[in-house]
């Protein structure tokens, strides 16, 4: 299992235990506590591991002075979060990567590795719903640009697909390059739809497109990747020392370095602008996508107590699915959205302490004693205090 340890980076001051990156991982906490920072670092180190596995770059290139800061951290605008005593260690299936004293170092691992399709879904995604290109934005992060590229590919595949909220559908008019949201008695352009749709549609559309591209192996190689793949294939078949069986084996091993076999979906605040029941349906749609391939991972940063409570429902349903009638469970939650208790980790971040702590669980169910639920309880206390003044 992958994990990451972070010390003295941005808002994160201390974290003694590695953060385990499970099939479903949540980060909750106040604004400025470092939720997105942790998620972005996970995305960054997973990308480096993937590049090393594919031999897109050699380790010496990554070890050059300031490459990590100026190229990789700047992608997510994290370059100024580095400190003199920053320590980060990421352990994946293919490589262990350590940043300390201003340098990256690598250790190759001999474990099965599912080459991932990585996607970071930024919180600014709702801009995309009413802008056709990043040229229309004066300032855009590299992450948002890449998300827009995936969104552009994804919408080209759409004719009409169901959305997970409001019993609605998404339609695409290719001639006019316009997306529409359609219900029983309405059809509106996405650019004129509610803010909830403008936030949800890019997230759902790209997630659905990418998981299907991995399942169906339709995600194209880049021009550079294809050139490198073809060159190495030619070298394999031109090698006079290989038998035919060895050539086939080497070609299959090479293909594994280029064919993606998992989808890692890293989503900032998926609850944006959504009513609680829509948050639930949105979450269940992401869990369904996550469950479509065994090696998939879903990483979420959130302020929403509803999402934490709904994921608890998914875990409890997963715990009892062998003991209860599936039809009865299906009336409560889609079977496709169930989560095994061992596949979930929820971390709380404390901006005052700069800490990251794993949320306790009871019988695999996340504890109710978390920052988000505690704030709901606090409103009851405040109301009771006011009643005492009457």
Region spans (language model):
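Conserved hydrophobic alpha-helix in the ABC-type ATPase nucleotide-binding domain
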Residues: 281-286
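Extended helical coiled-coil dimerization/tether regions that scaffold
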Residues: 91-98, 121-260
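Conserved H-loop
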Residues: 265, 296-306
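P-loop NTPase switch/coupling surface
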Residues: 1-174, 253-254, 292-295, 308-309, ...
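Walker B catalytic acidic pair
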Residues: 268-270
């Amino acid at each position: 299992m992958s994990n990451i340890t972070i010390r003295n980076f941005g808002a994160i001051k201390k974290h003694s235990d590695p953060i385990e990156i499970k099939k479903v991982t949540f980060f909750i906490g106040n604004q400025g506590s470092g939720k997105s920072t942790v998620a972005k670092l996970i995305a960054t180190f997973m990308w480096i591991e993937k590049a090393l596995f594919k031999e897109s770059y050699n380790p010496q290139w990554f070890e050059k002075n300031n490459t990590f800061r100026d190229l990789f951290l700047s992608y997510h605008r994290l370059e100024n979060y580095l400190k003199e005593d920053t320590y980060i260690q990421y352990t994946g299936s293919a490589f262990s990567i350590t940043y300390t004293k201003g340098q990256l170092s690598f250790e190759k691992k001999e474990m099965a590795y599912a080459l991932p399709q990585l996607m970071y879904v930024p919180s600014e995604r709702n801009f995309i719903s009413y802008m056709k290109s990043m040229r229309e934005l004066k300032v855009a992060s590299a992450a948002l640009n890449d998300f827009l590229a995936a969104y552009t590919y994804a919408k080209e595949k759409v004719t009409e697909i169901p959305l997970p909220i409001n019993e609605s559908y998404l339609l695409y008019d290719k001639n006019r390059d316009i997306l529409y949201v359609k219900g029983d008695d309405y059809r509106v352009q996405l650019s004129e739809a509610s803010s909830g749709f403008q936030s949800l549609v890019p997230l759902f559309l790209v997630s659905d497109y990418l998981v299907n591209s991995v399942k169906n192996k339709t995600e194209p190689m880049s021009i550079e990747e294809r050139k490198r793949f073809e060159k190495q294939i030619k070298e394999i078949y031109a090698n006079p020392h290989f038998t035919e069986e060895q050539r086939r084996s080497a070609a299959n091993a090479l293909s594994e370095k280029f064919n993606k076999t998992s989808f890692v979906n890293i989503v900032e605040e998926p609850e944006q602008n959504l009513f609680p029941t829509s948050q639930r349906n949105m979450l269940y749609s992401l869990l369904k996508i996550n469950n479509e391939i065994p090696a998939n991972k879903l990483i979420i940063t959130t302020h929403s107590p509803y999402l934490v409570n709904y994921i608890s429902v998914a875990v409890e349903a997963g715990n009892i699915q062998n003991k209860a009638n599936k039809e009865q469970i299906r009336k409560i939650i889609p079977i496709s959205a169930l989560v095994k208790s061992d596949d979930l980790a929820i971390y709380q971040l404390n901006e005052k302490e700069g800490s990251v702590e794993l949320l306790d669980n009871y019988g695999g169910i996340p504890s109710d004693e978390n920052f988000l639920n505690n704030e709901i309880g606090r409103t009851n206390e405040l109301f009771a205090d006011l009643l005492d003044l009457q």
